[in-house]
Amino acid sequence: AGTFWKGGNVWVRRTVNVPEISKDETLYLIYSNDDIATFYINGVKVFSTNEVHHNANVALDAMATAALKAGENVISATCEDTGGLAVLDFGLAVKREGEKLVLLNTAKQISADVQATQTHYNFVCGPIDLQVTFTAPLLLNDLELLSRPVNYISYKASSNDGKKHDVSIYFEASPRIALDYPFQDSMSEIVYDGDMVYVKSGSVSQGILQKKGDDRRIDWGYFYMAGDNGSTVAGVGKASALRSCFVQGGDVNSIGSKGGNDSGRMALVQNLGKIKKADGHVLIGYDDIYSIQYFEKNLRPYWNRNGDKSIFDEFNSAAKEYSSLIKKCDKFDRELMLDAENTGGREYAELCALAYRQAIHAHKLVEAPNGDILWLSKENNSNGSIGTVDVTYPSAPLFLLYNPKLAEGLMNHIFYYSESGRWAKPFPAHDVGTYPIANGQTYGGDMPVEEAGNMLILTAAVCHYEKDASYAAKHWGMLTT
């Protein structure tokens, strides 16, 4: 349990027991601060910062290390809150001896090409050229596909010396992908369903929608990585054991099928045999179970808004549609680059491609209890607000262009908030909460002129792009109040 701190200045002393320290060990100060902080060990200044940090670390220099002794030591800190959030936390850590290096050679990256829905990488791995593509089929005209929580990692391996070579592809994922902080307990396992084999991981606690705010990572629901059962072998265990097994040509499944924390690394292996050319892919996804709390009601993700689908249904659909979706993504990426380049030149086109996924992934698609589409944004490092109107406004052109219904989804929650009487002020709210909890505005200040202007202009833009004034008519009472 922490000590409540309202703001201003705070001073903290902690007594810690330190065992005998080896000269070969590196000690670190682990700290979080908001805002200005200075840290000391036994009266010796270690570190000072004017910037906000969360779970950061700094190696102790020779003077700070020399100030430590075996037994009791006093770590102290002072922190000044200059406004907004206030936090101070700190401790010591010792760097553990690293795991033995198993994968001795590093692939040489030749290129990276970021497109709207895909990123393409080229590597040279000795006598093998390897192309790797990450695909997120975020096609905005298809809401079912847009909300499907499954992406692809594809690869093409080809000999660069004209000879056949034994080729196997190894994929590894850490359980940290499903945790807020690294020290949380996790559990990973292998799951078989139909023609697919999965590795799955999630936190032990599974506190659904229990956290909100900035610098938070989802720690409920489960991460999945999957491949065709006929060509994919799965394993769970320590990273060193899985990698050693792979390098030695063993079966990673023999390492284990279930494990927690450090023993919960997940691996998939696809053995291509002795080849000159081959290709394949795996699927990755995340089932968040419930995505948003919307005025005291927990909402499922849009793809499972009726609660009648499973994550395995989504993976199966993604597997069946792999070839067709890759073609659609290739076509869309080409068209976006061509349109953008014709409009603003090559550099502008590259910026559009870079921003496409970023803008989309800043939002979550759910359906409101009244059937409205909700396309809810999250502010990063700015209160963590959800559905912020002045964040909606600059992202709106993308959604107006490709699917105006999503632009409606940027505003539906704000209209509902006022029309329901929950927000009684004569201008739009700034937000509807702190992500992912949308129970009402949490930002400290109103912005009546800015937010009203944003809502009026965007409503007019939706009607213009839809060539239909129905959306404005639906909310006419609020627009003219």
Per-range role (PLM):
Residues A1, A62-E99:
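An acidic-aromatic loop/edge-strand motif
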Residues G2-W11, S48-A56, G256-N261:
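Extracellular beta-rich ligand/substrate-recognition surface
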Residues W5-P19, V58-A62, H120-Y121, M266-L268:
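Short beta-strands within extracellular/lumenal beta-sheet-rich domains
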Residues V16-G43, I75-A77:
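Aromatic-lined ligand-binding clefts that engage carbohydrates, nucleic acids, or primary amines
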Residues Y31-D35, V114-A116, P149:
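Short coil-to-beta strand junction motifs in C2/discoidin
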Residues Y31-T38, T82-G84, N160-K163, D288:
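Extended, low-complexity, turn-rich repeat/linker tracts enriched in Gly/Pro/Ser/Thr and Asp/Glu
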Residues N73-I75, R96-T106, H120-C125, L138-V150, ...:
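Acidic/polar, glycine-enriched structural segments that form the non-catalytic walls/loops
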Residues K309-L325, G384-T481:
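Aromatic-rich carbohydrate-recognition surfaces in CAZymes
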